[in-house]
Amino acid sequence: MTTGPTPSIHESPTLELRANPDLGRYDLWDDQQFIGFLGVEILEDGTVDVQHTIVAEAFGRQGYARTLVTFVFDQFREQGVKIRPTCTYVLDYLQRFPSYQDLVADTPDPRNQE
């Protein structure tokens, strides 16, 4: 694991990450309010394409996207999941917080195989 700065996140006890596999995403809720989601696709080789980071307008620019990605990445790390980031926010996040680079798959993308 690469070291680097640690992302600051919201520490509210009412924040909850909910897996929503039917919609291919992880949802962030605060009490009963929907904050946003991280859209994902599980690929043939078991890696996860992280495609979209969306936060409701009312919660924008308050650090919720960073909190959402951090929560999901911490869960992926615990589960041994590798990612293939295509979301531009996630690509920027990985540049700012290289301690999560170990999650990035180092095998060829199965979608690019003939």
For every predicted segment, state its role.
Residues 91:
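Metal-centered catalytic cores of metalloenzymes
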Residues 67-82:
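Conserved acyl-CoA
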Residues 59, 63-68:
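Conserved acetyl-CoA pyrophosphate-binding loop and the N-cap/start of the following alpha-helix
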Residues 1-58, 75-79, 96, 109-114:
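Non-catalytic substrate-recognition and accessory regions of acyl/acetyltransferase enzymes
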Residues 101-104:
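Short, hinge-like loop/turn segments at secondary-structure boundaries
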Residues 83-88:
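Catalytic nucleophile loop
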